[in-house]
Curated annotation (Swiss-Prot):
The modification Phosphothreonine is found at residue 533. Glycans are attached at residues 47, 105, 131, 183, 202, 236, 262, 302, 341, 357, 366, 404, 428. A motif (Cell attachment site) lies at residues 151-153. It is a single-pass type I membrane protein. GO terms for molecular function: integrin binding. This is Intercellular adhesion molecule 1. Belongs to the immunoglobulin superfamily. ICAM family. Monoubiquitinated, which is promoted by MARCH9 and leads to endocytosis. The chain crosses the membrane at residues 481-503. Residues 1-27 form the signal peptide. Pfam families: ICAM1_3_5_D2, ICAM_N.
Length: 535
């Protein structure tokens, strides 16, 4: 790695290298580093170490600007500044009237100042060879400098950069159709990885290559094979590979009628867009013609125009009371078949029917009918959907209006109570006793004043239902009412436990003392009997 301006740590390292060289008895000079590569204009620190066993003169010999930045008895450190070109450096020593030298090669690298791809021909025939020139000005060392020819991001070739200013590097490629509009460029690469550095590179401004081709294929016509009477359908006609595409003329004709087209150009492609509308059933011919110069390419497609109205879907009646029989029927044109959701497998035909006993769960249910007609080998589908409305009375259940709420005072809560029914019932919840309203639907802090039992009434034209809702609010006082008895019971149980423990302990002590006294009496009696027995 190239050495720059020497910091204190680097100077210390160079000084250490000097102390490690052979001591008295030998004569010689060494240089460190033994080789280096640095950017042009950069600085380098060099150490000259002398192993002479007597006082001698030594130093660094160079034409470069140098500055001594450190020294010892047998070493000196020099700083070279503003190095512009490759050079060989010498450390010398005059010892015992003999001069010894040590040398190193200092390599300077710098980037090319300019790289350019020479101008391309205005038009390039497809299939012919194309000569491209990359011009490189400056850059060193040339032994590590090369040029790469790029097609977009693809690498086509690589060659070393020779001498000369600017250096000219030639490449030959065969132009292709897909090269039209492609950017070509030159990239120089200065590869100093073998020197402990990295790969440096830069790319020239791209030049776009224009290739000339007249295709022998017919235009591509995009049109639906079947269209409905009275509808408007997009038609696209494209042809790739034209140049210059802007000179191409495109015509779209339906039967004998020329369609108004919107023509756009993109590179070597031309695209014509038009809207097709036909009110007469039958098979019609659509033609696309692309003309460039005196040569034309034509294509033709047949379009079948059909009539297929939506199926007729009826609910009889569309709005019913709960538990009323509803008839669902779907009808389409002859030749088509219908499918009504909810019906079991029935023979396909133009008519389908379903009967059901409507319940509240059927309210707002969708009934769908699908009709299918085969036209020119393709199946066309039409769909119709209706919604059933079921009238039923108010309902208040646990899911939509829970009967019991217990919340902590001050917490943010939303009380939900919703009545079901069609028509939508009017809901009123008032507290027993004072008639206060239940705060439904809003997120708000819970206050103890809202606690109580509420009676919720849902009313509509189809009846009325009621439901009782209890709202409990936990607050400081009722928590104490719970905690104090619990603590009291705990203390009483603790006292009883302690008393029982003391009582049992005292009983065990008394029993132990009694057993001890009894044993002493028995031992005394045995001793007395032994003394009274004659020998």
């Amino acid at each position: 790695m190239a050495l720059g301006a020497a910091p204190a740590a680097q100077l210390a390292l160079l000084a250490l290298l000097g102390t490690l060289l052979p001591g008295p008895g030998g004569a010689g000079i060494s240089i460190h580093p033994s080789k280096a590569i640095i950017p042009r204009g950069d600085s380098l620190t060099v150490n000259c170490s002398n192993s002479c066993d007597q006082k001698s003169t030594f130093g660094l010999e160079t034409v470069l600007i140098k500055e001594e930045v450190g020294r010892g008895d047998n070493w000196k450190v020099f700083q070279l500044r503003d190095v512009q070109e490759d050079i060989e450096l010498f450390c010398y020593s005059n010892c015992h009237k003999e001069q010894t030298i040590a040398s190193m090669n200092l390599t300077v690298y710098w980037f090319p100042e300019h790289v350019e791809l020479a101008p391309l021909p205005l038009w390039q025939p497809v299939g012919e060879e194309l000569n491209l020139s990359c011009l490189v000005s400056g850059g060193a060392p040339r032994a590590h400098l090369s040029v790469v020819l790029l097609r977009g991001e693809e690498e086509l070739g690589r060659q070393p950069v020779g001498k000369g200013e600017p250096a000219k590097v030639m490449f030959t490629v065969q132009s292709r159709r897909e090269d039209h509009g492609t950017n070509f460029s030159c990239r120089w690469e200065l590869d100093l990885r073998s020197q402990g550095l990295e790969l440096f590179q830069n790319t020239s401004a791209p030049r776009k290559l224009q290739t000339y081709v007249l295709p022998s294929i017919d235009p591509h016509l995009e049109v639906p094979p079947i269209v409905e009477v009275g509808s408007r359908w997009p038609v696209n006609c494209t042809l790739d590979g034209l140049f210059p595409a802007s000179d191409a003329k495109v015509y779209l004709v339906l039967g004998d009628q020329k369609l108004e087209s919107n023509i756009t150009y993109d590179g070597d492609s031309v695209l014509a867009k038009a809207w097709m509308e036909e009110n007469e059933e039958g098979t019609h011919s659509l033609k696309c013609s692309v003309t460039l110069g005196e040569v034309s390419r034509r294509t033709q497609e047949n379009v079948t125009v059909y009539s297929f109205p939506l199926p007729t879907l009826t609910l009889s009646p569309p709005e019913v009371s709960e538990w009323t029989t509803v008839t669902v029927e779907c009808v389409t044109r002859d030749g088509a078949v219908v499918k009504l959701n909810g019906t079991s497998a029935v023979p396909p035909g133009p008519r389908a029917q379903l009967k059901l006993n409507a319940s509240a769960s059927d309210h707002r249910s969708n009934f769908s009918c699908s009709a299918a007609l085969e036209i020119a080998g393709q199946v066309v589908h039409k769909h119709q959907t209706l919604e059933l409305h079921v009238l039923y009375g108010p309902r208040l259940d646990q899911r939509d209006c829970p009967g019991n709420w217990t919340w902590q005072e001050g917490s943010e809560q939303t009380l939900k109570c919703e009545a079901q029914g069609n028509p939508i019932p009017k809901l009123n919840c008032s507290r027993k006793g004072d008639g206060a309203s239940l705060p439904i639907g809003d997120l708000r802090p819970v206050r103890r004043e809202v606690a109580g039992t509420y009676l919720c009434r849902a009313t509509s034209a189809r009846g009325r239902v009621t439901r009782e809702v209890v709202l409990n609010v936990l607050h400081g006082q009722n928590i104490l009412d719970i905690v104090i008895p619990v603590v009291a019971v705990t203390l009483i149980l603790g006292a009883l436990g302690t008393a029982g423990y003391v009582y049992n302990y005292q009983r065990k002590i008394q029993k132990y003392e009694l057993q001890k006294a009894r044993k002493a009496q028995e031992e005394a009696a045995l001793k007395l009997n032994a003394q009274s027995t004659p020998p």
